[in-house]
A protein has these predicted regions:
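Beta-strand elements within well-structured catalytic alpha/beta cores of enzymes
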Residues: 1, 16-21, 55-57, 78, ...
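Metal-dependent active-site segment of extracytoplasmic phospho-/sulfohydrolases and closely related
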Residues: 1-31
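Intrinsically disordered, low-complexity Ser/Thr- and acidic-rich flexible linkers and loops
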Residues: 2-9, 115, 175-179
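Loop/turn elements at helix/coil->beta-strand transitions in domains of secreted/extracellular proteins
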Residues: 11-17, 53-54, 122-123, 143-146
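C-terminal cap/loop subdomain of S1 sulfatases and analogous C-terminal strand-loop tails that border
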Residues: 25-37, 41-47, 64, 71, ...
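Tryptophan-centered short beta-strand motifs
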Residues: 26, 266-283
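The feature captures the short pre-catalytic strand/loop hairpin that immediately precedes
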Residues: 56-64
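Long, internal low-complexity/basic segments
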Residues: 78, 173-183, 188-257, 261-265, ...
Length: 346
């Protein structure tokens, strides 16, 4: 096709094509096989390679055709790369998490040292964080050819052998990567404990920097979870204007986090719930100020052992959670049920 903006040339001479996906294919659909990510393990909603590794095909002017690369890149790199390839300056007010892949694409696509941060340092690390939901309660970090998985669901879970898993996906020789264990078949956490500890510390530092959220434990889980008997008890609340005060009792575990969960449309067909920090005042007191228009609210307390106590007890009725919450309009908590028995996460 002729390029109308560039007489005498084809569109293909002035066009970059990027083909990729947002995640690995979904596996485990009941009754049928939709996708199979073999030889990679697992699929969508997993931090294993079958869930996080996706196809990536790029073509365009200056990019050598028919070349395969094992260099680690991700979707955050597309924006700075497109700006670079099209000659557009990065907006001064923008902080870009991705890297410009133009030096890699227009040079040696097998040379991982060409992928650099804006400060010029080579990027060799990536982090994935899937803290909630089903089989994806995990975080991972990849540094060079090694990948560490932190499983948050390892406590009292017979399906999980260890809190951490370590895999050697690639080995590097003379600056070039070669495939070693992208199937994640050989867990090296016991044979390389130092490597695992080092990467676990790097992962924790990265998650702390981004203020990541973590899964909470349910003290009413039937499993024998350690320290669940030490979860706090919420005693009372007092509402005045758009401020609310709660009183709670610690039972052996220190409360470390408090959040107010509120909605502006409680009781409607599609409720929306929001979270804001509440203030731990010491001596068993929590205070919070909620937005004008709030109809219902809950208090979430998390202790040092990562157990969650919700007040009042969260009971869903259909798709509504307002029925069991504190009602701002009437300031009531139903006396017919325990006000602080169960947590609302596992």
């Amino acid at each position: 096709t002729e390029d109308p903006r560039w007489p005498g040339h084809k569109l293909s001479e002035n066009t970059y094509v990027i083909f990729t996906s947002d995640n690995g294919g979904m596996e485990g659909h009941p009754g049928e096989i939709i996708t199979d990510n073999y030889p990679l393990d697992r699929g969508k909603i997993s931090a294993r390679e079958g869930g996080t590794r996706v196809p990536l095909l790029i073509s365009g002017p200056g990019i050598k055709a028919g070349v395969q690369s094992d260099v680690m890149v991700n979707g955050l790199d597309f924006y700075p790369t497109i700006l670079s390839l099209t000659g557009i300056d990065v907006p001064a007010e923008k902080h870009l998490d991705g890297c410009d892949l133009a030096p890699l694409l227009l040079g040696d696509v097998t040379d991982a040292s060409l992928v650099k941060h804006s400060d010029g340092s080579v990027r060799d690390t990536m982090v994935w964080h899937f803290p909630h939901g089903g089989d994806a309660m995990e975080s991972t970090i990849r540094i060079g050819g090694y990948k560490l998985i932190h499983r948050y669901d390892h406590i009292a879970n017979p399906k999980v052998n260890s809190e951490y898993e370590l895999f050697h996906l690639y080995e590097t020789t003379d600056g070039k990567q070669s495939r070693k264990d992208i199937e994640e078949a050989h867990n090296l956490v016991d044979s390389l404990p130092g490597k695992a500890q080092e990467m676990a510390a790097e992962l924790k530092a990265a998650l702390t920097e981004m203020k990541a959220s973590y899964p909470s434990l349910n003290p009413d889980c039937l499993a024998a979870l350690p320290h669940k008997e030490n979860v706090c008890t919420v005693l009372t609340h007092h509402l005045q204007g758009n401020e609310i005060e709660f009183r709670y009792q610690e039972n052996g575990a220190r409360v470390t986090q408090a959040d107010l969960i509120y909605t502006l449309n409680g009781g409607e067909k599609y409720e929306e719930w929001f979270r804001i920090p509440a203030s731990l005042k010491g001596d068993g007191k929590v205070t919070a100020e909620f937005p004008e228009g709030t109809t219902h609210l809950y208090l979430n307390l998390v202790d040092e052992n990562q157990f969650l106590r919700s007040y009042p007890e969260v009971i869903a009725k259909g798709k509504s959670f307002a029925g069991s919450a504190v009602s701002v309009q009437s300031d009531t908590v139903s006396p017919s049920r325990p006000v602080a028995k169960k947590a609302n996460a596992t």
